[in-house]
């Protein structure tokens, strides 16, 4: 089986598992994962960060946004177009409106920033492994947008999305620096290089 076919199969299986979560569980597990993130040095040391607007039962990020704004941090959200992802600053969640793929996005005209200017980038995903490998929706938006990032890239996920076996990775795929779930924080040794992950308590 090709890597593409393996990724497609994994993506389908885990998307179905995530879609089957009742909202009460999404809310409860998201709260735990967000609180873990808020307690990390990744969040504490950041002054400018990028978040995502949750879609299709992804881990929620609203609590992270609230704490970031209260702490005086600058928060940016992705806006998706045919050209790829642009990050635009958001000061209130009601500034996000339905855009591409029905995602809540900032509108054009807001302050923009490139990934190289962030102290932290928080992203979603469909599947991960403990070496920092990630499978997304298959569009490649984050893989293209984050090539120039030098800051930690942290994924929020449910524990069932973190696989014990290595997921199939292709040359263009971006690794994450850490994966935070409702149960644990996995910090990847070697940052974005995909080396063996180490489990850390938050």
Where are these predicted regions, by residue range?
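Short glycine-rich anion-binding loops that position phosphate/pyrophosphate groups of nucleotides
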Residues: 55-57, 126-130
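Surface-exposed, charge/polar-rich loops and edge strands
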Residues: 2-5, 9, 16-20, 71, ...
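Charged helix-capping and loop-helix junction motifs
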Residues: 66, 136-141
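Glycine-rich, N-terminal phosphate-binding loop of Rossmann-like dinucleotide-binding domains
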Residues: 53, 125, 183
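A short beta-strand-loop-alpha-helix capping motif that often carries His-Thr
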Residues: 84, 121-125, 138
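N-terminal active-site beta-alpha-beta segment that forms phosphate/nucleotide-binding
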Residues: 2-116
